[in-house]
Amino acid sequence: MYFHIMQKIQIYDSPLGKLTFVSDGLALTGIWFDKQEPLQQILKAPHEVCNLPIFDETRLWFDTYFDGQQPGFIPRLSLIGTAFRQQVWRNLQLIPYGETTSYGTLAKQIGQQLGKNKMSAQAIGGAVGNNPISIIVPCHRVVGTNGTMTGYAGGIWRKEFLLDLEVKHRR
């Protein structure tokens, strides 16, 4: 899925542990926590640890974010996935900083956008769970219908940390 060209990577030390930035050389194609399966696959394929302007932008974004400020920009992204997944990921980017939405609400929104009466929250959950750009594409802002902390590839404790950080610094 990500291996058509040699991947460029860089490691970022965050308050949540190491994040690996992945790029095609021009845009971000992934941001992964250690031990996530997609990262393990990337590391098995030919890759190069290097410095790129996109990594400089991404480090600045994360430095700003973890300093409790809402970054005023988004690094260039290359979201690789089906049209449906890309639509879900675009909708994730519309969830305001410091706020959450439920899988069901997201399913209704996307169903309306697609002209469908119903959309499965499970289908939405599958797309959310396959988000390749952790934190910048804020899948951590999606919670269970009753506000429960459900499913986060980086671990529920990281999801709680991110939401607490955003709520604390929301303007």
Model regions: which residues?
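Compositionally biased, low-complexity segments enriched in small residues
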Residues: 1-2, 155
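Histidine (H) residue identity feature
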Residues: 4, 47-50, 140, 169
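DNA-contacting interfaces and partner/effector-binding or oligomerization modules
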Residues: 2-29, 37
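Compact structured core domains
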Residues: 25-74
